[in-house]
Regions:
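Active-site-adjacent "subsite" loops/lids of carbohydrate-active enzymes
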Residues: 12-32, 101, 106-160, 253-257
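Short beta-strand-plus-loop segments that form exposed binding edges in beta-rich domains
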Residues: 595-605
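Substrate-binding cleft of secreted/luminal carbohydrate-active enzymes
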Residues: 256-260, 264-282, 296-380
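Pro/Thr/Ser/Gly-rich low-complexity, intrinsically disordered linker/stalk tracts
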Residues: 363-409, 466-481
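Glycoside hydrolase catalytic-domain groove-lining segments
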Residues: 193-242, 246-317
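Recognizes extended acidic, P/S/T-rich segments that occur
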Residues: 412-452
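Catalytic domains of carbohydrate-active enzymes, especially glycoside hydrolases
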Residues: 32-58
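Beta-strand-rich modules
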Residues: 446-468
Length: 616
């Protein structure tokens, strides 16, 4: 299975599809419900949620532009008693789940009576901005002031909240209603002089919104993703040779969504077409459309995710193909034949939870049994490699701690594990089977570790756009290793005098840097201090960068229970790895356990970088 893959589900708020499940819930009940959705995503090894925060020209945050959403309290404009968007982002990030805020640009209401809107609603204050169609109210996409207002309303959330992405779905101009005409002739007469027909003008109105949102989002937050989930068919090949071998509704013509253009122009970071049909469906075959969209994104920087119809699987009234538990999982197997497909989004959360006919359980068993990293995007450099500071067997597994490398704080970390000795296979870190956990913290307990056996752990760091660092040095945990700690030269347990310099020159260093000093005929030792939990035997290992100009006989001092022992190490060779000084009997307590002395007759810098102490 892929190591990098977006795994997401839509959490819809309009008409209380997913969250909140009903209006009028208490703050604590609403929050508990949302946490349960995140917990479900985490249980399924998903790494993102797409949450509807502006369903009907309203807001799930205290917006200066639009009223509080009626789907929170039952009454539009009523304060729910907390900031839902701030709460949701915080809870998602605490689980290392990305939060993509989902906005519907033009829909105002699921009715056509403006008097039912709160009196301060912009659509009520500006009647010329709206039109009724098909029993609903919409903002008119052809009015420039409307477009600017919608963009401002969305950008308020972008600039004020730590969201990871902005998401638009398939609702642009309304879907056609038989016998009705969109009442925008006056706007076309006023603003459409440069276009030969109203249809090209309408498409341009949507194009302007998409292009301008792309520009504004990335000006405010260059790392934030902007994506659209359009209807799955752009155009049929029978209409346009660039179209797909399908015979369904054409979103280019029906709702004026030129989604292919957005990809080819690079106006979106990702496209997530809603390919809501089964494999073999005559009018719109899943395999045909997945291949077509793969061709569209090929050669661009736009990522392709697939919108999946979890709501169809096992549902009453659906085609027989959807009554087969393997329909959805077969979609993801088909995706693997297209390297352009980098993940999936499932509609919607309640259907993921329902797991009708076991379809979701089958899919997660086949494809989501291990965690996955979100696909990287952009060209930012990866963070520096972190360093593992401790790896200790505890009653419920192995407890790990680490620290960042370099000056830039990573957004998240990935933990890898190999059974037995350190990894030698160069493909180890590309293999999803070795990825154990992702987290935004700097500690993790591996509860899957057996009580016996040897494991080696590694940690990598990710930036905001998911570029991954080189791995940390491997940390070995053995059956008897009830205590193991690393003291790096940047840790609080390290001390050295002013004659010790700091360098990050060598790539063989442990962590961000190392210490160096000239040899002298006095000790002036650098010391590594830690708390030794109990008296007994310990293995002492040292890490240093090697260089032909470094010292050939650097004195390392071990403070054993019987007194100091000196072990001389040739630091010209065998650098960039753990090197054992031997096993020693240590006393319990907190003290300077290992030192690096400057007192040597040989020339070349003596190096103090990191020490590892493991109980035998």
């Amino acid at each position: 299975m892929p190591k990098r893959q977006l795994r997401a589900m839509w959490i819809a708020s309009v008409v209380n599809i997913d969250w909140p499940s009903q209006t009028g819930l208490s703050v604590s009940a609403q929050q508990a419900e949302f946490r349960s959705w995140l917990d479900l995503a985490a249980q399924k090894n998903m790494n993102a949620v797409v949450v509807q925060v502006r369903p009907t020209a309203d807001a799930f945050w205290p917006s200066p532009y639009e009223p509080w959403s009626q789907w929170l309290t039952g009454t539009q404009g009523t304060n729910p008693g907390y900031d839902p968007l701030a709460f949701m982002v915080s809870e998602a990030h605490a689980r290392d789940i990305e939060f993509h805020a989902w906005f519907n640009p033009y829909r105002i209401a699921n009715h056509d009576d403006p008097s039912r809107l709160v009196p301060s609603h912009p659509a009520r204050q500006n009647p010329g901005w709206r039109f009724a169609y098909g029993g609903k109210l919409y903002y008119n996409p052809g009015i420039p002031a409307v477009r600017g207002f919608i963009e401002d309303a969305i950008m308020d959330a972008v600039t004020r909240y730590d969201i990871d992405g902005v998401h638009l779905d398939d609702y642009f101009y309304p879907y056609p209603v038989s016998g009705q005409t969109i009442p925008d002739a006056a706007a076309y007469a006023e603003y459409g002089a440069d276009f030969g027909n109203i249809h090209d003008w309408r498409r341009n109105n949507v194009n302007l919104l998409v292009r301008e949102m792309d520009q504004r989002i990335h000006t405010a937050k260059p790392w934030a993703e902007f994506g659209v989930s359009p209807f799955g068919i752009w155009r049929n090949a029978s209409t346009d040779p660039l179209g797909s071998q399908t015979s369904g509704l054409q979103s280019y013509d029906a709702i004026y969504a030129d989604s292919r253009l957005w990809v080819r122009q690079g106006w979106v970071d990702y496209i997530a077409p809603q390919i809501y049909w089964h494999i073999g469906y005559p009018a719109a075959d899943y395999k045909v459309l997945t291949a077509w969209w793969s061709d569209v994104v090929r050669g661009t920087d736009v990522q392709l995710f697939v919108g999946q119809a979890a709501y169809r699987a096992g549902a009453t009234g659906q085609d027989p193909a959807w009554q087969q538990p393997d329909e959805l999982t077969n979609h993801l197997y088909d995706n693997r034949g297209h390297p352009e497909v980098l993940g999936d989004v499932f509609f919607s959360a309640k259907d993921v939870r329902a797991n009708r006919i076991g379809s979701i359980a089958r899919l997660t068993s086949d494809h989501y049994s291990r965690p996955a990293l979100i696909p990287a995007y952009g060209t930012a450099p990866a963070p520096a490699a972190p360093s593992i500071t401790s790896a200790t067997r505890v009653t419920n597994g192995v407890a790990l701690s680490w620290q960042r490398g370099g000056s830039i704080t990573p957004v998240s970390y990935a933990v890898y594990r190999v059974n037995d000795s350190p990894a030698t296979d160069p493909c180890f870190f590309a293999d999803a089977r070795n990825l154990l956990k992702t987290t935004r913290g700097t500690s993790f307990t591996d509860t899957t570790a057996a009580a016996t056996g040897t494991y080696t752990y590694y940690v990598t760091a990710m930036d905001r756009t998911h570029h991954e660092s080189a791995p940390s040095a491997g940390r070995v945990v053995t059956s008897g290793g009830s205590f193991s700690v690393v003291i790096d030269n940047g840790d609080a347990g390290f001390t050295a005098g002013s004659n010790w310099g700091t360098s990050s020159f060598s790539s063989q260093r442990y962590g961000g840097d190392y210490r160096f000093a000239d040899p002298v005929t006095s000790s002036d030792s650098a010391w590594f201090r830690t708390a030794v939990p109990s008296a007994g035997g310990y293995r002492i290992e040292v890490w240093y960068p090697a260089n032909s100009g470094y010292n050939s006989s650097t004195p390392f001092i071990v403070a054993t229970s019987g007194g100091n022992q000196v072990i001389n190490v040739d630091q010209r060779v065998n650098g960039g790895q753990w090197r054992s000084l031997g096993t020693f009997t240590l006393s319990a307590g907190t003290y300077n356990v290992v030192g690096v002395s400057r007192w040597t007759a040989t020339s070349g810098y003596v190096i103090a970088d990191a020490v590892r102490i493991t109980k035998l």
